[in-house]
Amino acid sequence: MNPAAEFDLIVYGATGYTGRLVAEHLAQRYGVGGEVKWAMAGRSADKLAQVRDEIGAPKDTPLVVADASDPASLRAMVRRAKAVITTVGPYQLYGSDLVAACVEAGTDCLDLSGEPNWMRAMIDQHHAAAQASGARILHSSGFDSIPFEAGVWFCQETAKAQLGGIVPHPA
């Protein structure tokens, strides 16, 4: 985590459907200048301001312009936050540079990816550097992960019922 950051949290992709819902929740729950310092981020300041107004967020809600096709803008954005929630997908097209920027800055990153091959690639590429920088990268923190989580739960319940407990992972 980036302890000297200006914001606790930046919602990247705040003008999209899911990002808008996240920003609306934060606006209702925390307002601006409260216990959680947060900002809305996306490609267009005008669209961010429009969404801010539509969701009823305070006029002084910070807006950060960053573009997935501009790695320098992503690096500048993530340096301002302790954590980034990104709703900008598909992640295999738009998420890799953001993960790299977060790892470099020591900024936590949470995504909604349901793209296992991309997640594996990000882990393989960035795990050691993330450990060194203190960045925590949390993939698949949304609806797309429900089928996987339900599958794991089903396997655990089946193992408990048929084998009397969860089968330990081989070391």
Summary of predicted features, one role per range:
Residues 138-144, 148-171:
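Conserved anion/nucleotide-ligand pocket segment
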Residues 113-135:
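Rossmann-fold NAD(P)-binding glycine/threonine-rich loop
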Residues 31-47:
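Conserved glycine-rich Rossmann-like NAD(P)H-binding loop of the short-chain dehydrogenase/reductase
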Residues 7-32:
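N-terminal Rossmann NAD(P)H-binding glycine-rich loop of SDR-like oxidoreductase domains
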Residues 51-59:
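Short, conserved SAM-binding/catalytic segment
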Residues 90, 99-119:
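ADP-ribose/adenylate-binding Rossmann-like module
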